[in-house]
Amino acid sequence: MLTLPFDESVVMPESQMCRKFARQCEDQKQIKKPESFPKQVVLRGKSIKRAPGEETEKEEEEEDREEEDENGLSRRRGLRKKKTTKLRLERVKFRRQEANARERNRMHGLNDALDNLRKVVPCYSKTQKLSKIETLRLAKNYIWALSEILRIGKRPDLLTFVQNLCKGLSQPTTNLVAGCLQLNARSFLMGQGGEAAHHTRSPYSTFYPPYHSPELATPPGHGTLDNSKSMKPYNYCSAYESFYESTSPECASPQFEGPLSPPPINYNGIFSLKQEETLDYGKNYNYGMHYCAVPPRGPLGQGAMFRLPTDSHFPYDLHLRSQSLTMQDELNAVFHN
């Protein structure tokens, strides 16, 4: 089977008149194209007047495009810094001034609108000026409170109205709003229920126990706190018992009721020592000598009994009263030997 190559001339034969006419039109178009383009460019150049700044920019772009390499091909160039000419610097400066003027006008308009809003909201003061964010928050709360009044159709209570106005506001703004509406700020805080108890409670009440005593009054500087827990007497001698072999059973902090016998001697509030008989002085003097930190030089036993003169100075100006002075000479001999 013979096959012929596909040819448009064979499938669709054209007449001689159409063929000649089409070829003549194509020849005229090819001739007219290069002539029409420069004419349009010339006409555009005559009709449109360009600014000097735009002409310089166009010339710079054309110079960049016309740069060619040695072979005649255009070179690909990356970002390059434009020439800082005097005209370019003036143009940049003019644009910056225009942007600054637009921003200044915008801020002036915003400040004027906020001033008008401050006159409308129920918080106007000649001495104190609300900040921008506080003004916007108060205006939002005011619009919401008025919409709630219109929705319910009843006149609300003054306290609830102020509470709705002051949601999310700072404390100075809240006080200012309450003062403008002739409402005491303290009663406003007390009317908030659980929040009032939280504000009036001292932050130190969780760390320190309440102070209570049946005999002593409340010390100055302490408020009337919860008296359910009474102050317990603490035994301070337990910390010193590890330093001695025999602990003193009488070394304990006294109760606030106080004994009827002669009062005990207080070691500057650390612990107390009651007056004992002459037979028990061995324990107390051994305890007192260790407290004074006076090292004995002689061969003294642990159970040695001696007495101290009243003129010897103990720490914290302690003087033992009503003690016998029968062994004063023996004590002096022990220390000087």
UniProtKB/Swiss-Prot annotation:
Segments forming domain bHLH: 94-146
Signal peptide limits: none
Regions of compositional bias (Acidic residues) in chain numbering: 54-71
Coiled-coil ranges from the UniProt annotation: none
Tissue expression from the record: Specific to the nervous system of both embryos and adults. Highest levels in the cortical plate of the cerebrum.
Disordered, as annotated region: 28-80
Residues spanned by motif Nuclear localization signal: 80-86
Gene Ontology, cellular component aspect: nucleus
Gene Ontology BP terms: cell differentiation; dentate gyrus development; positive regulation of transcription by RNA polymerase II
An MF annotation (GO) of this entry: protein dimerization activity
Subcellular location: Nucleus
Keywords: Activator, Developmental protein, Differentiation, DNA-binding, Neurogenesis, Nucleus, Transcription, Transcription regulation
Pfam families: HLH (PF00010), Neuro_bHLH (PF12533)
Function according to Swiss-Prot or TrEMBL: Activates E box-dependent transcription in collaboration with TCF3/E47. May be a trans-acting factor involved in the development and maintenance of the mammalian nervous system. Transactivates the promoter of its own gene.
Subunit structure: Efficient DNA binding requires dimerization with another bHLH protein.
Protein name: Neurogenic differentiation factor 6
Record organism: Mus musculus
